[in-house]
Regions:
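Acidic active-site catalytic centers that drive phospho-/nucleotidyl reactions
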Residues: 19, 104-105, 174, 186
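Short, glycine-rich, amphipathic interfacial segments at transmembrane boundaries or analogous
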Residues: 51-90, 151-170
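Positions in alpha-helical segments
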Residues: 23, 51, 92-96, 173
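C-terminal terminal-structure detector
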Residues: 5-10, 141-203
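Structural signature of FAD isoalloxazine-binding scaffolds in flavoprotein oxidoreductases
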Residues: 2
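A hydrophobic, helix-centered structural microdomain
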Residues: 5-74, 111, 183-203
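A short, structured surface patch at a secondary-structure boundary
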Residues: 84-147, 190-193, 197
Length: 203
């Protein structure tokens, strides 16, 4: 085993330790906020407050990703559809608020604790869209090398992906992160994400 291998394994271990520590801390500190978000969604929905959907994670393995429900129960009765900011009628009133501040993502703290996700990494996608992206750019498979994230470099600078062209652009940002990831870059992404969430800036 080379010095580079040891350094890489140590970096992966430390990032995982950081993810667990921060996720546990946030779950405790954010209990009032989690309860408030739960109540906002509960008063508008007859069904489940939580939305779960299969996504593809590290090593290409599927997992269930959790969110607070922000759309109507029948949002995808006609099949997979991309969210379109500002003009998506499937969004509920509470859901619009949660999405504006990205609070619908809070349940993914559980995904982090389970080891499915990291705080920072490429956003996990559905197999339906991965298959279509891979036809255009097979480099997507490189992203399977790391855990997907709650936030990402691509999310901050590419925003919501409501077209295939934006998905391909997001992939370029994700590949940049994959090959340039560092503690400094992760800190920049996390701090920028929290700042945008507080001010309600769209990203």
């Amino acid at each position: 085993m080379t010095v580079s291998d040891v350094s890489s394994r140590m970096s992966i271990f430390l990032k995982r330790l950081f993810d667990i520590s921060l996720a546990l801390s946030m779950l405790i500190v954010c209990i009032p906020l989690l309860l408030y978000c739960y109540w906002l969604v509960w008063r508008e929905h007859d069904g489940s407050v939580f939305f779960k959907q299969e996504r593809i994670g590290r090593y290409g393995k599927p997992f269930m990703m959790y969110k607070f429900r922000s759309m109507t129960m029948d949002a995808e009765y006609q099949g997979p559809a991309l969210y379109q900011p500002g003009k998506d009628t499937r969004l509920t009133a509470a859901g619009a608020f949660l999405r504006a501040h990205h609070l619908d993502e809070l349940p993914q703290l559980w995904n982090i604790l389970c080891g499915d996700m990291s705080f920072v990494g490429p956003r996990p996608e559905r197999q339906f869209y991965i298959d279509r992206i891979m036809i255009r750019d097979p480099r997507y498979a490189q992203l399977y090398a790391i855990r997907p994230g709650v936030t990402s470099y691509a999310t901050l600078y590419n925003g919501y992906t409501d077209t295939m062209e934006k998905m391909l652009m997001r992939l370029k940002w994700d590949l940049y992160y994959l090959h340039h990831r560092s503690w400094r870059l992760d800190f920049h992404i996390l701090s920028t994400t929290f700042r945008y969430m507080i001010v309600g800036k769209k990203f």
